[in-house]
Amino acid sequence: MGGTSTDVSRYAGRYEHVMETTLDGVTIQSPQLDVNTVASGGSSCLFFRNGLFVVGPDSASAHPGPTCYRKGGPLAITDANLVTGRLAIEMFPRIFGPNENEGLDIHASLQAFEALTTHINAETGRTMSVDEVAQGFIRVANEVMCRPIRSLTQARGFSTSKHVLACFGGAGGQHACSIARALGIKTVVLHKYSSILSAFGMALADRVFEVQEPSNETWDHTPATLERIQTRADALAKRAQDELLAQGFARDRIHLEVYLHMRYDGTDTALMTLKPADSWNMESVFVDTYRQEFGFVLSNRAILIDDIRVRAVGRTFDSLGPSVLAEHAAQGTRYAHAKALDTASQRPVYFDGEGRLPTPIVRLKDLSAFEYVPGPAILIDETQTILVEPRCIAHILTQAVLIEIQYDEGRP
């Protein structure tokens, strides 16, 4: 979650790719990560229209920015987080205002919300407070961000509650707990560089080279057909491997994956099907994937192969250490209560259904690995704000913060 939009993708042991996408009516045929984007970010504008709270898609952008940027901008999600107490003004640089030498202006945000609240109450006949109005917009923004997550999980036959929510972007930590709870997710992970991880991650990422050829084969189980497919796949694999060898990767650091773009005859929905490591039993993989995504199979239809694709992955690192979940599991219950809480300053923060609660503000650099922080709390550093809501517990690990979401009996 950044300033203008939120990007969502799903990872289940491997990256999910699409071969084409449509943006603003234009179809782009190019392999890319399957990423859904919605207009909900820190600068998404807030409106009250036809009796409804509306967030986006208009954006205040970086200039003029939200109202609190001191440039006459409109109300935005950042203003809602500010007036509800979720942002630590003192941590923001003094780069706002006409001369870009001032801090955030919470008073401007409050005045704008007071005017909007008066308008909403007059139109609806209700007596909402500024906090309730601001929280209402935050709730709408969270729901907007939940939709693409449901599209990538529930709409494809996967239970959202069985996933971990990994959050990135400067605004992600402010909404992570609320979104996880709305989706029934029990665990949230935020890397210590989550707000700048696009740059950090590129330095650590594996390098990938793909080659593909169109095909008009029918998967008919005959040795001749399989031999033709294998021969073409082997040739593509050599091309892909040679490319990474030329880029300096050792042969033992290159991993090859073979895919067939398969579909049922008479349909236009092809699925990229990964070849199993120890066989060419592609039909069963395709059928299982099709059933998972659509809930049925067309057992009386022939299976066509639209193209053959080989992906070569050059490993940048053998290992980056234990995963966050593995480190948390190894630590078990041996977390210590965070000592920094004893001296932390507090401020009243508004929480949905709870009202204003005294909430400690703790700098991440003051927390040691394998300490825990019960919610409510705000964890901050120079690049991010993590809101730990009530009935949530933040566990500090060596490279990340892992938040456990607690539910009532019978909930996920």
Short names for language-model regions:
Residues 3-27, 242, 246-248, 253, ...:
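Extended hydrophobic/aromatic-rich secondary-structure runs
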Residues 11-86:
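Early-domain small/polar-rich strand-loop-helix modules and first-structured segments
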Residues 1-12, 44-47, 177:
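Gly/Thr-rich phosphate-binding beta-strand-loop-beta motif of the actin/hexokinase/Hsp70
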Residues 1, 39, 165, 179:
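Residue-level signature of catalytic and energy-coupling elements of molecular machines
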Residues 5-7, 39, 195-201:
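FAD-binding core of FAD-dependent oxidoreductases
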